[in-house]
Swiss-Prot record:
The keyword Cytoplasm applies. Belongs to the UreD family. Required for maturation of urease via the functional incorporation of the urease nickel metallocenter. UreD, UreF and UreG form a complex that acts as a GTP-hydrolysis-dependent molecular chaperone, activating the urease apoprotein by helping to assemble the nickel containing metallocenter of UreC. The UreE protein probably delivers the nickel. This is Urease accessory protein UreD. It comes from Albidiferax ferrireducens (strain ATCC BAA-621 / DSM 15236 / T118). GO terms for molecular function: nickel cation binding. The keyword Manganese does not apply. The gene is ureD.
Length: 276
């Protein structure tokens, strides 16, 4: 049996409070809205009760953040792509921000189990003045649990339409990509953190983002396998390779906290679910 689930989230600023309205179909839900930072920022947790995806499953997530609203979204656990007999398992996420909206898209990692056929699509659309901090973390198997990624294929698509596009394929049979120093160099976790804007970044703010991330990198255990760049005036990207998810997540969380402070003048308040 395959699952086809959709979830639409719509955040609006009402009387200075970011309010969520949502519609779902299938096994994809959102938990109660929380406001640990006050009414201006709405925290939510997305849950997928089946716990993972197999061949033929699809998850479609549509998120809109209205003018002036601020949403932070995470998940309670990893997205797991299990072995497939042929059909791909697909997750599609579209984030759309209106003018002056802010959003933080901070799901936990996606785990690729051996034998999976998986696709992950993530797209952003930002109106002028909107800003997004988002990350994407992928683990190739669970090697420390004796479950390496030795078969399967993963397609990744990340896009800010008309501005920036990343598209790649990881095939477990591609030993040059997985093992070469010019590829993943034997690392089994890859992660990216993005700061994306609806308007071109002015140089002082761009430098704040770059310098803040580089200061964290210089003191981090992953400094030799991470870097931060500005490939477009509307995008700043930090990328990292790591032997395990925990190290990559530690780096991303630290840079996220710095970016929140220097770019938005807001202290980082971690979602409560992360402490469980």
């Amino acid at each position: 049996m395959t699952w086809h689930a959709t979830l639409s989230l719509d955040y609006r600023l009402e009387s200075e409070r970011s309010v969520l309205r949502h519609v779902h179909d299938g096994p994809l839900r959102v938990l109660k809205s929380l406001y640990p930072q006050g009414d201006g920022t709405c925290h939510n947790v997305l849950v997928h009760p089946p716990g993972g995806l197999v061949g033929g499953d699809t998850l479609d997530i549509q998120i809109a953040v209205g003018a002036g609203a601020h949403a932070l979204i995470t998940t309670p656990g990893a997205t797991r792509f299990y072995r497939s007999s042929g059909e791909p398992a697909v997750q599609r996420t579209r984030l759309r921000l209106e003018a002056l909206a802010r959003m933080e898209w901070l799901p936990l990692e996606a785990i690729l189990y051996s034998g999976c056929q998986a696709e992950n699509h993530l797209s952003f659309e930002l109106a002028p003045g909107a800003e997004l901090i988002a990350w994407d973390v992928t683990a190739l198997g669970l090697p420390h649990a004796g479950l390496p990624f030795v078969r399967g294929r993963f397609c990744q698509h990340i896009e800010l339409p008309g501005v920036w596009l990343e598209r790649g394929v990881i095939d477990a049979a591609d030993t040059r990509l997985l093992g070469s120093p010019l590829g993943l160099a034997g690392q089994r976790c890859m992660a990216s953190l993005f700061f994306v804007t609806g308007s071109a970044l002015e140089r002082p703010r761009r430098d704040l983002a770059l310098d803040g991330a580089r200061q964290i990198l210089q003191a981090h255990a992953l400094q030799s396998s991470a870097g931060v760049t500005c490939p477009n005036p509307r995008v700043v990207v930090l990328r990292v390779l790591a032997p395990q998810v925990e190290m990559a997540m530690d780096l991303l969380k630290k840079v996220w906290a710095v970016w929140r402070q220097v770019l938005w003048n807001q202290a980082a308040v971690q979602p409560r679910i992360w402490a469980m």
